[in-house]
């Protein structure tokens, strides 16, 4: 920036994870974890005239991205997560308030103070320090977000696979389908079969080449030659398909290109 004679606006990504005895509740996102870290960084900013601090990001992943009412988890696990969330929120709010005070004392005027994610919109909205809310996956309301106690989103996206084989009377095999969500591995990262109301096979799951499922009900195959799924998280559809079909009352009302369709690969 200095070589180009420009001033580059920058934002700080500040860690708002909470460490409990024996449990690190959050993500390893930033080295700015406490007041001393932030003050040390602010102290060197005057030596960087080509940089202008304009924003702060404080993503509370442990609230926004961790399910607490998931059917695939036992009751004790869900109860523990809800307890940790409740105990995390006061720490997060206090730390954000301290961040605000430190920045004000340093004469920094922010354009935005960012926080939030799909699973934490309500709690972040109530945080006075935050001026900008972020949510991404919530636009699609994918399957992982069925597992939250505080909100129930309405599914807004999914995908269809062609059923190409019937290797057993109650087993149907789709072409492709291995569209897995990111993050820690587990069955909750698999696509969720919506139609017909069957279940994936434990030994195969959703595969790059094929996705078999078991269904003992009535299916007029090969006339009924498709299965409908919901993806688990957010990026799977835009990574795998060139465009999304926009449906309105059962009819195709338009088409929207994904970043794959635009020839983009960001990460």
Regions found by a protein language model. Give the residues of each.
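C-terminal accessory subdomain/extension
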Residues: 166-267
């Amino acid at each position: 920036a200095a070589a180009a004679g420009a001033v580059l606006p920058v934002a700080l990504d500040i860690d708002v994870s909470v460490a409990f005895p024996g449990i690190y509740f959050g993500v390893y996102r930033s080295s700015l974890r406490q007041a001393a870290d932030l003050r040390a960084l602010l102290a060197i900013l005057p030596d960087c005239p080509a940089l202008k601090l304009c924003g702060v990001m404080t993503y509370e992943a442990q609230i926004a991205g961790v399910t607490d009412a998931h059917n695939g988890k036992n009751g004790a696990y869900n109860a523990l997560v809800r307890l940790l969330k409740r105990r995390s929120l006061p720490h997060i709010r206090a730390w954000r308030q301290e961040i605000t005070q430190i920045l004000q004392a340093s004469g920094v005027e922010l354009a935005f103070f960012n926080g939030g994610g799909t699973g934490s919109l309500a709690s972040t909205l109530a945080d006075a320090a935050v001026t900008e809310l972020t949510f991404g996956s919530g636009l699609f309301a994918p399957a992982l977000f069925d597992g939250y106690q505080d909100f129930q989103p309405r599914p807004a996206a999914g995908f269809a696979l062609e059923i190409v084989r019937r290797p057993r009377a109650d087993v149907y095999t789709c072409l492709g389908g291995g569209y897995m969500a990111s993050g820690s591995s587990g069955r909750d990262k698999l696509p969720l079969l919506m139609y017909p109301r069957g279940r994936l096979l434990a030994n195969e799951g959703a595969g790059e080449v094929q996705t078999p499922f078991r269904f003992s009900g009535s299916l007029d195959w090969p006339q009924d030659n498709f299965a409908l799924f919901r993806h688990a998280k957010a990026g799977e559809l835009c990574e795998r398909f060139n465009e999304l079909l926009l449906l309105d009352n059962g009819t195709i009302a338009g088409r929207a290109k994904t970043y794959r369709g635009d020839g983009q690969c960001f990460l």
